[in-house]
């Protein structure tokens, strides 16, 4: 009969979530690199578009760029947070950030200006992985025998 240490199961779940966030980040990165490298519109027109302050109908402001940076940073932070947060905070952080990232990814597909087949492919992989992260965190149950103190349950 196989016995499993509850602490090991918890650490394995944390490690898997962290690894999934790394996978998502690599997909984000390479989708953007390939878009910048292979998209003719970006190669020829990006500077003019950004200088005008608009890309398509989107007004590029410091606030817009900051929002993009925050979205990227939340994914980067989840690599670390998935490893160090306690059960309850970890579970909810993965669910909330995963859902936010799914919405952002779906939104990125609505603008036709820079879409390429490879971008759609990467985004589909990202969304599938993010859906798995949300499901994996959602189905994560408190380890049996673990009793949360009031201080732990608030974290």
Task: Map each language-model feature to its residues.
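Membrane-water interface at the C-terminal end of transmembrane alpha helices
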Residues: 128-148
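Membrane-helix boundary connector in multi-pass membrane proteins
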Residues: 90, 103-123
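Cytosolic juxtamembrane helix and N-cap/initiation of the first transmembrane helix
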Residues: 1-28
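Helical transmembrane-bundle signal
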Residues: 21-32, 75, 79, 98-108, ...
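Hydrophobic transmembrane helix segments
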Residues: 24-65
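Juxtamembrane helix-break-helix junctions at the cytosolic face
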Residues: 72-92
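Hydrophobic alpha-helical transmembrane segments of polytopic
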Residues: 20-24, 67-71, 93-101, 122-125
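Extramembrane terminal tails and long inter-domain/linker segments of multi-pass membrane proteins
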Residues: 1-9, 141-155
